[in-house]
Amino acid sequence: MQRVTITLDDDLLETLDSLSQRRGYNNRSEAIRDILRGALAQEATQEHGTQGFAVLSYVYEHEKRDLASRIVSTQHHHHDLSVATLHVHINHDDCLEIAVLKGDMGDVQHFADDVIAQRGVRHGHLQCLPKEE
C-alpha cells in the first residue's frame, strides 16, 4: 500500500468527514479508498466488453397502460442478463422490482435504460460492479 498526500478545500474536507462519520469509516483513508473504488467501478461499467454484475431497482405503477407486460417483455428480450428478480407489492398501485444482472456492462446499461425509460417507472437506479479478474 502506498501513502499519498492530497489537498482538499475546507468545505470538501468537512463533507468528507461528515460522510465518514455517517458511514462508520474508521479514518479518512478508508472513506477515500471506497469513494475511489466506486468511481473506478462506475467508469469501468460504461465500456462495452467489460463483464460484471449489477442490481437494477425501480418502482412502477403495475396498472399503468400495460406497463407490467412491457417490463416483462423487456426482461425476456434480455433474458441472458437476468440472474434473479425480486418483486415486492408496496401498496395497491405500486410495485418495487429488484433485478440482479450479469453480463456485458454495455448490455446491462442498455437493459436498465429500456426499463427506466418506460412511462410509469420511477426511482430507477442501476448499481454496477465490474467482474474482478
Curated annotation (Swiss-Prot):
Cofactor: bound how, per the entry note?
A: Binds 1 nickel ion per subunit.
Fetch the Gene3D superfamilies from UniProt: ACT-like. Chain A, domain 2, Met repressor-like
Alphabetical UniProt keywords: DNA-binding, Metal-binding, Nickel, Repressor, Transcription, Transcription regulation
Q: Which cofactors, if any, are listed as required?
A: Ni(2+)
* UniProt-annotated binding residues for Ni(2+): H76, H87, H89, C95
What is one Gene Ontology biological process annotated in the Swiss-Prot or TrEMBL record? response to nickel cation
Which InterPro entries does the record cross-reference, listed alphabetically?
Acetolactate_synth/TF_NikR_C (IPR027271), ACT-like_dom_sf (IPR045865), Arc_rbn_hlx_hlx (IPR013321), CopG (IPR002145), CopG/NikR_regulator (IPR050192), Ni_resp_reg_NikR (IPR022988), Nickel_NikR_proteobac (IPR014160), Ribbon_hlx_hlx (IPR010985)
Which GO molecular function annotations are given, in alphabetical order?
DNA-binding transcription factor activity; nickel cation binding; sequence-specific DNA binding
- Domain of life the protein comes from: Bacteria
Q: Does the keyword Transcription regulation apply?
A: yes
The answer to whether the entry has keyword Coiled coil is no
Mention any Pfam family matching this sequence: RHH_1
Similarity field: Belongs to the transcriptional regulatory CopG/NikR family.
Report the protein's function.
Answer: Transcriptional repressor of the nikABCDE operon. Is active in the presence of excessive concentrations of intracellular nickel.
Q: How does it assemble?
A: Homotetramer.
Official protein name in the record = Nickel-responsive regulator
Underlying gene: nikR
